[in-house]
Curated annotation (Swiss-Prot):
Localization annotation: Membrane
Task performed by this protein: Plays a role in the regulation of lifespan in a partially daf-16-mediated manner, and may be involved in regulating the levels of reactive oxygen species production in response to heat stress.
Keywords, comma-separated and alphabetical: Membrane, Transmembrane, Transmembrane helix
Pfam family, one: PDZ
Origin superkingdom: Eukaryota
Source organism of the structure: Caenorhabditis elegans
Annotated knockout phenotype: RNAi-mediated knockdown in young adults results in an increased adult lifespan. At 37 degrees Celsius, levels of reactive oxygen species are reduced compared to wild-type animals. Double knockout with atad-3 RNAi results in an enhanced increase in adult lifespan as compared to the single mutants and wild-type animals.
SUPFAM superfamilies linked: PDZ domain-like (SSF50156)
Name the record gives this protein: Mitochondrial scaffolding protein 1
PANTHER family according to UniProt: DISCS LARGE (PTHR23119), DISKS LARGE 1 TUMOR SUPPRESSOR PROTEIN (PTHR23119:SF51)
TM segment ranges: 240-262
Length: 269
């Protein structure tokens, strides 16, 4: 499975460098990863690969977070906020799971809308592999949670899909040994370091600047009202027409003032 770096324009573009190396069956893995100082970080046992299927009702769980809408202060990750008990994801995905990658797409540096689009782009019936950190939520207990808007990974309900479907053959979580053969050593280290906050300074500079809840969701896809254009007389309008208009008004006022002064002086003689 490929774990690609974050993309800005498209979530499926993996052409830019660098890309992490391809996992092979003969790769060996350590039980723990190390940070830049050589100290042990999170063990691989904290990571879990699960398989989830998209049905006509979606994946059956909601997500929160993102670079523009962090769920925790200083944490830009994507989290599972709730799971539908009648969905196939129930028992496989849990509330509080942190999504690290989805079908090889790095989810650790996505905006909220980019993460939603990744899930929406999957076709019905597709079984996706999702790498999650199930123990990371315990590290956030002392952090202050900020208000966020939960987005449902479920399409809009129509009269044809209102009937309750019986879910069978629920996908099971993959074992730790099985997940090791599908994940890259370098890819996991990069994802974990990003999760733990050991990111580069340039990524910190691009970190979130607003903790406002996202107003965009799958089931509430209402476009925002466009901003009213500024008039030519509005001082906030920086167009050359506005500047020319104000210069003309100023020159006209000076001309009229000069003419009136001339008539006044001439009349007194």
């Amino acid at each position: 499975m490929m774990v690609s770096p974050p993309q800005e324009d498209t979530v499926f573009n993996t052409d830019s460098d660098p890309v992490y190396e391809q996992a092979t069956d003969d790769m060996t893995f350590n039980d723990t990863t190390t940070d830049g100082n050589g100290q042990e970080s999170v063990p691989l046992e904290a990571l879990t690969v699960v398989e989830i299927e998209k049905t006509s009702k979606g994946f059956g769980f909601n997500i929160v977070g993102g670079t523009d809408n962090p769920h925790f202060v200083g944490d830009i990750g994507i989290y599972v906020s709730s799971v539908n008990s009648e969905s196939k994801s129930y028992g496989v995905v849990r509330t509080g799971d942190k999504i690290l990658s989805f079908d090889g797409i790095d989810m650790t540096y996505k905006t909220h809308d980019e993460a939603v689009e990744v899930f929406r782009s999957v076709k019905i019936g597709h079984v996706a592999k999702m790498l999650i950190d199930r123990e990371y939520l315990h590290l956030q207990e002392d952090r202050t949670q900020t208000p966020t808007a939960s987005v449902s990974i479920t399409p809009q309900v129509t009269p044809q899909t209102r009937s309750t479907q019986n879910n069978t053959d629920t996908p099971k979580s993959m074992s730790h040994s099985e997940s090791k053969s599908r994940l890259t050593s370098h890819g996991l280290s990069a994802v974990i370091e990003r999760i733990r906050g050991k990111v580069y300074e340039e990524e910190d500079a691009q970190s979130v600047t607003s903790y406002a809840p996202s107003t965009h969701s799958i089931i509430d896809d209402v476009p925002r009202t466009p901003r009213k254009p500024l008039s030519l007389l509005d001082p906030r309008n920086n167009s050359w027409l506005t500047e020319a208009l104000y210069v003309s008004i100023g020159l006209g006022a000076l001309t009229i003032s000069g003419y009136l002064a001339y008539r006044f002086i001439r009349g007194r003689r």
